[in-house]
């Protein structure tokens, strides 16, 4: 039994079955067929641990979002202390944290007037594409064949056809792909 407080699983196999049923059967099958039916249990620093406790060096780091390693103690502490005062906020109203952070960002980037916040990489790509279209008054976007830029709106349209086609990317003629 693997008990995580809010949820539990009888076995690794039962978790794999639930992941295939409710999350992403394609990824579960891909890794199982590749001989790597690993289930990540937790992450610390530059290591991952599978459900059996086996420690592995994380060479993937999922797009470079963990430059300090997973769950870096200083960052965990800052986040915890921040939660004593701040919450997720409301993007419609000014906030203390958002204004202070925006000011710091703008002051570090020459010729920047505003900071725009996004929830993740796909949203950052969306913002960049919309900004480029607005600034140039042009619609066409050039991206790299088989590239991955996210799974939302414009970002999915710039990526691999296997994703853009199934999500019915609008106006495919506006997206040109070139070799890397």
How would you describe each model-predicted region?
Residues 56-57:
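Generic structural signal for well-ordered beta-strand positions
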Residues 50:
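Acidic surface patches and DE-rich sequence motifs
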Residues 1-44:
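Active-site-adjacent loop/helix segments that line or gate small-molecule/cofactor pockets in enzymes
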Residues 60-61:
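Short clusters of small/polar residues that mark proteolytic maturation junctions
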